[in-house]
Regions:
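Surface/interface-facing alpha-helical segments and adjacent flexible terminal/loop regions used
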Residues: 1-60, 66-133
Length: 133
C-alpha cells in the first residue's frame, strides 16, 4: 500500500515566514520564485476583509444611530454616542486609506440598514423605527 505524499509548502506551515519570503522576492525582482497562486489568494482575502470591515462598521454605526434617535433610554445615550463617534472615525480612516471602498459603502448601505433594522426592531419592539433611512 502506498501513501500519497502531500507536498507541504512554506505557505502551508508558516504564513509569516512565507509573507517575509514573498516580500523579499518581490523587492529583489525575483519574480520567477514568487508563489503567485497563494499570493493571489492572500490579496483576494485582503480585499474581501476590507469590504467586510466596512460593512461591519457601517452596521454598527447604523444600529447605534437608530437606537440613539428612537430608543428612549437616556442612561444608554452616552455609550451609543461614543460608539457612533468611534465608528464614524474608523470608517473615515478606512475610506481615506482606500477611497475605492466608498463605492462598496454606498452599495452596501441599504442592505446593512435592512439587516440592522430587523435586529433593533426585535430587540426594542416597543419603539417605532423608520422603514427607510
Amino acid at each position: 500500500m502506498t501513501q500519497a505524499m502531500v507536498k507541504q509548502t512554506l505557505y502551508d506551515y508558516d504564513l509569516n515566514l512565507w509573507l517575509e519570503t514573498v516580500i523579499s522576492q518581490l523587492r529583489s525582482g525575483d519574480l520567477q520564485n514568487v508563489d503567485i497562486e497563494n499570493l493571489i489568494e492572500e490579496l483576494e482575502g485582503l480585499a474581501g476583509r476590507d469590504k467586510r470591515e466596512v460593512a461591519s462598521r457601517l452596521k454598527t454605526l447604523i444600529e447605534h444611530i437608530l437606537k440613539r434617535c428612537y430608543v428612549d433610554m437616556p442612561n444608554e445615550f452616552r455609550g451609543w454616542e461614543v460608539t457612533i463617534r468611534t465608528q464614524r472615525f474608523e470608517l473615515e480612516q478606512i475610506l481615506e486609506q482606500s477611497p475605492s471602498l466608498k463605492r462598496h459603502f454606498v452599495e452596501s448601505f441599504d442592505k446593512c440598514f435592512k439587516f440592522v433594522l430587523e435586529d433593533v426592531r426585535s430587540d426594542y419592539s416597543q419603539y417605532p423605527f423608520p422603514d427607510t433611512w
